[in-house]
Amino acid sequence: MPTGPSRRDFLKAGVAAAGALGLGAFAPPALARVRPPKFTHRPVPNAWRQAGRILARVRPPKFPHRSFDVTAFGATGDGTTDSSDAIRHAIKRCHAAGGGHVVVPAGTFLTGAVHLLSNVDLHLESGATLKFSQDPAAYLPVVYTRWQGIELMNYSSFIYAFEQKNVGITGDGTLDGQADNSHWWPWKGSTVFGWNSGDPNQNADDTLSQQMADDGVPVSERVFGAGHYLRPNFIQLYRCRNVVISGVTILRSPMWEIHPVLSHNVTVEGVTVDSHGPNNDGCDPESCSDVVIQGCTFDTGDDCIAIKAGKNADGRRVNVPSQDIVIRDCDFVDGHGGVTIGSEMTGGVSHVFAEDLRMSSPNLNNCLRLKTNSLRGGYIKNLYMRNVNVGQVAQEAFLVDFYYEVGPGFGFNPTVAEIDVRNLTVGQAKKAFYLVGYPEDHIQGVALTDCVFSNVANGYTVQYVDDLELSNVVVNGIRLPNTTAARAVVPV
């Protein structure tokens, strides 16, 4: 491996990136102007000490040694008998007794919405499957929820808890949402997922929900549910404390799989998500703090992990960030982004630590994906990633996208600052990294250290970035010149 590129090789590596921006090999003088950075603090290695403190704080809840077998309340594991009432009664009895485990034994149990209560662990034994009804009426009445970053009243998530503490979903069993191209997924409005012209879809309701939020309509009056087409998420824990989701396998969700909202002290461990429908994100903590996601496998139809914090006007109204999150020892297969932040990030996202991750699929677009726009506002800062091995991704290994859905000009430019990536190895990618801010609002403070990108088709792109630090970064066998606080606004 060469110790440094020649000037010819160095320019060759950046030409493809510059061309992608329409800049040619060199940027015009106007692009060389930079603005003073808003942030002066730089990413530092000892930031990882905070990850250790988060891991020390986050502890899964403990449940009393009591068991309530759902079959004792009338549940039947034949796959066709509706066991909703039996499961509901078991949960209420467990809660009233002071807590414990609601046990689903081996068998296939059909159910509608499951609402968890404080001190209750829903435990699926090996061989147990909870199969969720395909009838939308099974998820009524509507509940207080958040749909793509906006608070409203909608169908219940399949498993839901509201303002509870000490709740669990554990065991070796399976949660099967039964969503497919005939149920739930067509509401996306895509022919890929079974929608046909003239069929109902979510588009009008999506627009209406955003307009209601912009107009300040009270959440209690933003009523959807029956007669509307906003798909519920699989698991949503809303304003909860002390949550554990462990061991289960999740299949075929209508939309996002695991969605804690405004919750604190959340552990997601040893979970397998295998769901390839529209917007089938794996785990999306939103406006949460003290979250640990570890030992999980994500094989999804959208982002594997996406950290969120509300959207646009409603995100500014609620104004609660996601922060103090650790992701470690996970496997990522298909999906749009491996570790993603946004696009619903208006309340802000900070102090996210991701380490010891494995990713590889021609259907995984990005390893690290930050997506936002000038409607969102908010911030993404203090993001730290290390020790990540990527076999291949379909697009950019590391993407900062200020142009997600729309570009500049809407008055709420986001702040992206203090990103530190170390020991990232990528075997194949369309582009090594794509870091592009706005001319008037730059990305601020990105450090890449000991990163190797091989078999890269189109180089890399950097524009409108203040304080880019490169140390031992290799692209297609060419070691890029080390930089210290270099203000890069063109492909380097």
Task: Identify the function of each model-found stretch.
Residues 2-492:
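Extracellular/periplasmic carbohydrate-active domains that bind, remodel
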